[in-house]
Amino acid sequence: MPTITEDCIDGFQQYYSRPPERPKKKSLKQMVYDSEDNSYFGRSMDSWAKIGIFYVAFYGVLAALVAICMWAFFQTLDPRIPKWTLDRSLIGTNPGLGFRPLPPVDNVESTLIWYKGTQHENYKHWTDSLDDFLAVYKVPGLTPGRGQNIYNCDYNQPPPKGQVCDVDIKTWSPCTKENNYSYHKSAPCIFLKLNKIYGWIPEYYNRSNDLPANMPASLKTYIAEVEKTQPEKLNTIWVSCEGENPADQENIGAVNYLPIRGFPGYFYPYQNSEGYLSPLVAVHFQRPKRGIIINVECRAWARNIIHDRKERIGSVHYELLID
């Protein structure tokens, strides 16, 4: 058993002993290459070789697994046919209706078309916007595959498989670029398009004695006239544009639809064929009242298009204000 004296001596020696020697600091050059143990960054060449082989093998196998998984995934996809369509897709089976021109990008949430017909600079945004939107319809080369796939369709002459119907821009007059889309006459043209839904087949209102009660009277009369004179055109998705409220209906004035009052049925179903462009309807407001906001609602009419003003289903809303 140690004595008190021995304990004191041990404590004294421990307290006053020389601290352990620390390794000398290495210079940057020695950190890169240490000639004493022939190492690079603290590892020998053999150690670096083993680490390199491990990571090359690890990431090589990982990349191969990812490539195999991606290859298997893409085998389930078709570049032209969506995996999920109609009821199984997020888009659903009720196409929406869109309009052009749109307000400036800094006011993207607005639906107001407001300008002065007597000032070119004031309505220039709207006509330029239509120029940009309609460019693909005027120059087939802007749409891949359109130049060689165009087919002159008709109601009795649908497009063959792999070809697309031509959109005849000559039938839009006076809603043309050369005529400033009639904006300078305070009688603007608004273009309507139906959103594309792959595989959707419209169910037409093609009998004048079987039309919905809420269809505008003017459209009912139009369908009855088509039934008498051009029955082959009854397979059409009809279009109507009216004032939303009684005051709007009074102020909207006469409305003309070009080339016809709807989207021809031979453009459907949409099959994502190369070069396809959606058909358009030019809505020409011939005499809208100036100096007052006119709320306009346009609807697309087919048996399988549902309308809901609150949800904007099957219809589109915008306002006109011409000073």
Curated annotation (Swiss-Prot):
Residues 72-323 are extracellular. InterPro entries: Na/K_ATPase_sub_beta, Na/K_ATPase_sub_beta_sf. One of its GO terms (biological process) is regulation of tube length, open tracheal system. In embryos, it is expressed in the neurons of the CNS and PNS, in Garland cells and posterior spiracles. In adults, it shows a nervous system specific distribution: optic lobes, brain, thoracic ganglia and axonal pathways in the leg. Both isoforms concentrate in the adult head, isoform 2.2 being predominant. Both isoforms are weakly expressed in the thorax and very poorly expressed in the abdomen. It holds the Pfam family Na_K-ATPase. It is a single-pass type II membrane protein. Disulfide bonds join 153-165, 175-189, 241-298. It is found in: Cell membrane. One of its GO terms (molecular function) is ATPase activator activity. Glycans are attached at residues 180, 206. The chain crosses the membrane at residues 51-71. Coiled coil: none annotated. One of its GO terms (cellular component) is septate junction. It comes from the Eukaryota. Residues 1-50 are cytoplasmic. Keywords: Cell membrane, Disulfide bond, Glycoprotein, Ion transport, Membrane, Potassium, Potassium transport, Signal-anchor, Sodium, Sodium transport, Sodium/potassium transport, Transmembrane, Transmembrane helix, Transport. PANTHER family: SODIUM/POTASSIUM-DEPENDENT ATPASE BETA SUBUNIT, SODIUM_POTASSIUM-TRANSPORTING ATPASE SUBUNIT BETA-2. Belongs to the X(+)/potassium ATPases subunit beta family. The sodium/potassium-transporting ATPase is composed of a catalytic alpha subunit, an auxiliary non-catalytic beta subunit and an additional regulatory subunit. This is the non-catalytic component of the active enzyme, which catalyzes the hydrolysis of ATP coupled with the exchange of Na(+) and K(+) ions across the plasma membrane. The beta subunit regulates, through assembly of alpha/beta heterodimers, the number of sodium pumps transported to the plasma membrane. This is Sodium/potassium-transporting ATPase subunit beta-2. It comes from Drosophila melanogaster. The gene is nrv2.
